[in-house]
Regions:
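Metal/cofactor-centered catalytic core regions of large enzymes
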Residues: 1-142
Length: 142
């Protein structure tokens, strides 16, 4: 969901926490969401329509957002005296992998017969969240 005002407050220091990302409830839900987002993107391209964009700011502060196939992409800039003082990006991968919350939700309640099955389930969950960077899985037996 586009919410540039909430991000502006966070980056200006008037909010303690960034907005909470929407996390899928299951691996299947994550894939369904990605399919819907791909359909929206394809329809926009076919119609020659712009992709949704939102912005907020003032007094040298600005936040811009757009929807991507993997979620909301946010860019923020602070300009003072004609110079960029701060520039930040919050990508969908940041939102889903900044902590273990999304993966924990996708894997909650699962039990696996073997380390190989656990690795397969974890890999499916990571792929459902669609990171934009390469990743390596490391399992530690507890």
């Amino acid at each position: 969901m586009l919410a540039p005002e909430a991000w502006l407050g966070y980056w200006q220091g008037t909010a303690d926490q960034p907005p909470v990302p929407v996390r899928p409830a299951s691996v299947a839900a994550a894939y369904r969401r990605r399919l819907v987002e791909a359909e929206v993107a394809a329809a926009a391209l076919a119609a020659g329509a712009p992709y949704p964009v939102a912005a907020a700011g003032g007094d040298g502060w600005g936040v811009g957002q757009t929807l991507t196939a993997r979620g909301v992409l946010t860019h923020a800039a602070h300009v003072a005296e004609g110079r960029i003082v701060s520039y930040k990006i919050w990508a969908p991968t940041d939102a889903l992998f900044a902590d273990a919350g999304a993966l924990t939700a996708l894997l909650a309640g699962q039990q696996h017969a073997s380390p190989a099955a656990a690795r397969q389930a974890l890999n499916a969950a990571v792929l459902a969240l669609d990171p934009c960077l390469p990743y390596t899985l490391e399992l530690q037996d507890a």
